[in-house]
């Protein structure tokens, strides 16, 4: 039964991308089976079995295009439904839909499944059905089982009984619609999809869902089977629009290549001239070999875009559909006859054989007569075999039952040349063909195995390359880290050695500092002892000072007692003078009253004045007789000499106990103090001289006043009754008051001078005592000078000897330190030389290994050695 491929065209509405581009629909629907494309670069009218517009429903597509195909499958025919079109044209939507549970959104495949099980449920009970399904995809020209995704490179085989099939493909027996849906979901989840600029979920492979239905009549034993291929082709892609790159670009190349092979097969099937159909150029065309010009009833759904944005792709799709519509298939029922039918056919064949044998014998006799040259009358000719002609006609009109085979040779032998292109003209025997198919299957298995091995090897190679790249990067990083760590280790090693060397030097310096510390400790102990001695001396000096103050107090008391300046005596003298003054006043009043003054009164007044004069003279003698100027000068000189001796002794003591810097500082301070003391003493002596002169003048003045008073008394007594005026009395009283004030001032000065005199006497006594001690210790002044000279020489020699000893000790210490530093430096040089030698050996090894010189690091090592070494004559920075 010859039939053409049914071609159905479906247009989808414009999508978001086309609207954003400002495109407009360019398709017109002239009739239910005709559409016209009107665009600048593409135009034409196309006629198909049916054309569905942009508002068509899924149910409309199924009812017209697919429902008869389901009935054919149940009658034992093979069927194929596949969708073709550019990417994003709606192929997957047409085949699968959006939702299996939504009646409006379900696609062709779910509706076919529902129709199959509905037909099975409505069939007679004498027929048994078996339904099995399989799901595969062709991704990157490799057949992958979607129900077992680990099987990603299955081979294609061809056998006499089974035809073309995929070896190793999992077939699942199903008994309900839901089980088929589960298989569809399971396979759909494993299918490869990706996002492009044309489609958010673009199929990157051709998917093929196969439904095989086997039915058997339990009463007659007859059986027949049908196989339905539901193909969702990946869309053709234009890279400029999809923006494919990387892996997506490689997938697009493989998709376009397989679609080009499909187009070549269709072209060769429809041109009527090709002697070879290139089914084996692509695995897609190889699997669909029976669907394209073989034992199958095929429906092609072409999906198109109505937009001007994709006008060129739409034109190409419509032309593809027109070419496919010209393909003629010869479908036949895949049936197995029952034993009764086979017996009837056998009896019929045997009767035909008997008839044919009789007819052949008649024809052979007639032929022999003709060969002998005899003529056979026309009425004796063998008549045509009417039964044979009728049988041939009946056989031609009735489809002959056969085994379920889709072998290409049988279908092609029965297909007229006008309907499809011829197969290769080389005749092949049945045995040779079976051997050829067997050999082809073996080679196909080997090819598949080799492809699997190649794929595994390529994967291993990629993994190895990635691992090698990673290892190279890691090795480079490790080498850099190793070099860095090596340089750091060398640096740390050099720093460690430098620190060890510095530690040795520090130890040497520490030893020298310890020795210096010991010496300073000894000197400190000595100074402490000297300080203790000085404190003891200070205590003795304090005691001596207390004794001195005591003696001073005693001498002051003794001296003041000599002056008879006690309170009682002084009061009596004052009373005497006051009585004299009162007596003079009374005489003055008596004289003023005009009374006569007795001479006895004048004698008594004269005696009292003489007594007063004696008291004044006694005070003058006590003050000036005990301390003359010469004695004071002599005593001052002795005290100054004694002070110089004490200062010299003190300086000697400081020189023995202090260093040169301290001695110089103390000398400077003493010189300043001595000069200040000298200046103070000179000023004090000058002040004393001035005061003595002043007091002498005052005494002379008092003498003059006293003489004046005596003269007045005498003159008063001579006048005997002549009273002086009131002014004279007042003058005498004023003079007496002034005398009283002067007397008090003189007494204060006298007491101060007595204190100074006592101090000088005490100092003089101490100086005399020391002088006597010195005289007792030395026979004469010459011997004393000689001893002083010898002592100074001895001190100088001792000082020089001490300096020499100190210099010798310091030099010995410096020599020892220098020797230890020299030993440490030699060890350091030896270690650096060994390090340099090791570095040179390592650099030589690395140079031979990597093929490039590394001598610049030797310069670095030399530079490091030069930086780490320093002159041998450097002295330690320590205090000797």
Curated annotation (Swiss-Prot):
CDD domains: Khc_CBD_cc, KISc_KHC_KIF5. Residues 4-327 form the Kinesin motor domain. Transmembrane segments: none annotated. Keywords: ATP-binding, Coiled coil, Cytoplasm, Cytoskeleton, Microtubule, Motor protein, Nucleotide-binding. One of its GO terms (molecular function) is ATP binding. Residues 428-849 form a coiled coil. One of its GO terms (biological process) is microtubule-based movement. ATP binds at residues 85-92, 235-242. Pfam families: Kinesin. This is Kinesin heavy chain. It comes from Botryotinia fuckeliana.
